[in-house]
């Protein structure tokens, strides 16, 4: 996995001073690395009867859509308010300084459908915890929350269902 980790660029002082941002765009732009990353994650779910991959705006769309394609599953978008055209279920959640809201179509997941939730990076876990609540409210069965990478020192895993978190890479 080191070959994939080494492609991810560190950007110091972004988005603010003191933060070292893990820039995944370098991995996404490198076709062999992107393919390897998707293949490695998808392999974990082969034979698990995944119906949908729930993806989180915006970088989660890239990873989750490729993953859904490999698994023969549908894609369900989770977006910021006002971006989805039909009836939505919304969830407001707390951030370090304030709150945010996400929406999902109310008819996107049928009761009992087996889903994975995919995003690029697990940091504090706040966004993913909100998405877990949304999927459960719609009746979806969460197989796992999966990430390309996890920033372990931020402890986001603790906010998610125990035993249902997978990260390909850890920092």
From Swiss-Prot:
Key words, A-Z: Cytoplasm, Glycosyltransferase, Purine salvage, Transferase
GO MF: adenine binding; adenine phosphoribosyltransferase activity; AMP binding
One matching Pfam family: Pribosyltran
Catalytic activity of the protein: AMP + diphosphate = 5-phospho-alpha-D-ribose 1-diphosphate + adenine
GO biological process, one term: adenine salvage
Domain of life the protein comes from: Bacteria
Entry EC number(s): 2.4.2.7
Compartment list: Cytoplasm
TM helices/strands, residue ranges: none
GO cellular component term of the entry, any: cytoplasm
Enzyme category, top tier: transferase
Pathway(s) of this molecule: Purine metabolism; AMP biosynthesis via salvage pathway; AMP from adenine: step 1/1
InterPro entries in the record: Ade_phspho_trans, PRibTrfase_dom, PRTase-like, UPRTase/APRTase
Assigned protein family: Belongs to the purine/pyrimidine phosphoribosyltransferase family.
Quaternary context: Homodimer.
Known role: Catalyzes a salvage reaction resulting in the formation of AMP, that is energically less costly than de novo synthesis.
UniProt protein name: Adenine phosphoribosyltransferase
Originating organism: Geobacter sulfurreducens (strain ATCC 51573 / DSM 12127 / PCA)
Lineage: Bacteria, Pseudomonadati, Thermodesulfobacteriota, Desulfuromonadia, Geobacterales
Name of the coding gene: apt
């Amino acid at each position: 996995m080191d070959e994939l980790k080494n492609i991810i660029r560190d950007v110091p002082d972004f988005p603010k001073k003191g933060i070292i941002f893990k820039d995944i765009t370098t991995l996404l732009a490198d076709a062999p690395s992107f393919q390897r990353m998707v293949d490695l994650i998808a392999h974990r779910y082969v034979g698990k009867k995944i119906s949908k991959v729930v993806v989180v705006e915006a970088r989660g769309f890239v990873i989750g859509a490729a993953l859904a394609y490999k698994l023969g599953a549908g894609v369900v978008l989770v977006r910021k308010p006002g971006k989805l055209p039909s009836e939505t279920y919304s969830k407001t959640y707390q951030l370090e300084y304030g709150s945010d809201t996400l929406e999902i179509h109310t008819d996107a997941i049928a009761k009992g459908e087996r889903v994975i939730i995919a995003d690029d990076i697990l940091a504090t876990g706040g966004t993913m915890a909100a998405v877990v609540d949304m999927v459960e409210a719609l009746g979806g069965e969460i197989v796992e929350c999966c990430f390309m990478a996890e920033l372990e020192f931020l402890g986001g895993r603790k906010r998610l269902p125990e035993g249902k978190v997978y990260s390909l890479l850890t920092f």
